[in-house]
């Protein structure tokens, strides 16, 4: 039996107590995992189609739930805590990682809002926590800023959720973060913030030769 923690050895022991203490064998773990997945996949009932179609649907649904990854743990008091990859400190609350928004902002995250509204609300708050801790919204977290993925796709998640009634984050804080990232480029990472932003606002486009990927950024 192996456990881990991003926080401390003591927290790893606590994770073991919460997740594996009292578990008899691998079959029990397997059964609990199957029950957990059935609960999530059971949120959608498919009608019509062949058995192969249903298998394809639920396989895709399963894959849609693999990211973003949970990056928080529960302490002895049952409170969510996490080691932040953005400032190197331990904070109370929720944090998620391993998402590059590579078209997930178009469909997966709106789907998450429908199927997992509580988790999605926590995820949105974690985006702004990352901004508070690092000065920038994540563009590709792995587990902190990886520097990849052009565009500011976190903007669309925050706007979409607010329009649909999610209130887990401060809209003024979100607006501040979006304005900041739309009018500046981080001194680290290729795609954190918005490179070429000045040319775009002055000329209406990002010209070739001044920054990478000008067509996509325009």
Predicted regions and their residues:
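Flexible loop/turn segments at secondary-structure boundaries
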Residues: 7-10, 67, 71, 81, ...
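Acidic/polar, glycine-enriched structural segments that form the non-catalytic walls/loops
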Residues: 1-95, 136-137, 167-186
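Alpha-helical support elements that line or immediately flank enzyme active sites
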Residues: 57-73, 97-120, 159-164, 218
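Active-site cavity-forming subdomains of large catalytic enzyme subunits
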Residues: 134-218
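Extracytoplasmic/secreted envelope proteins and their assembly/folding machinery
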Residues: 34, 38, 61, 108, ...
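A conserved hydrophobic secondary-structure block that centers on an alpha-helix together
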Residues: 47-50, 94-98, 108-110, 117-122, ...
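Secondary-structure capping and boundary motifs in well-ordered enzyme cores
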Residues: 52-53, 94-103, 146-154, 217
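Short secondary-structure transition/capping motifs
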Residues: 26, 49, 96-100, 112, ...
């Amino acid at each position: 039996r192996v456990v881990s923690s991003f926080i401390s050895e003591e927290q790893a022991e606590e994770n073991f107590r919460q997740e594996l203490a009292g578990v008899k064998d691998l079959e029990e773990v397997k059964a609990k995992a199957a029950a957990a997945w059935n609960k999530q996949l059971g949120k959608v009932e498919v009608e019509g189609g062949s058995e192969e179609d249903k298998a394809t649907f639920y396989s895709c649904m399963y894959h849609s739930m693999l990211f973003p990854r949970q990056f928080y743990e529960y302490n002895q008091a049952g409170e969510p805590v996490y080691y932040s990859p953005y400032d190197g400190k331990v904070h109370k609350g929720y944090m998620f990682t391993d998402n590059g928004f590579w078209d997930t902002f178009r469909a997966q995250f709106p789907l998450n809002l429908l199927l997992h509204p509580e988790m999605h609300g926590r995820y949105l708050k974690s985006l702004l926590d990352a901004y508070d801790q690092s000065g920038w919204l994540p563009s590709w977290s792995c587990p902190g800023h990886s520097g990849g993925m052009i565009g500011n796709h976190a903007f669309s998640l925050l706007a979409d959720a607010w329009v649909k009634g999610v209130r887990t984050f401060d809209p003024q804080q979100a607006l501040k973060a979006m304005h900041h990232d739309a009018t500046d480029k981080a001194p680290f990472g290729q795609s954190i913030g918005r490179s070429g932003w000045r040319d775009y606002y002055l000329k209406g486009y990002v010209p070739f030769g001044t920054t990478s990927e000008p067509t996509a950024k325009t």
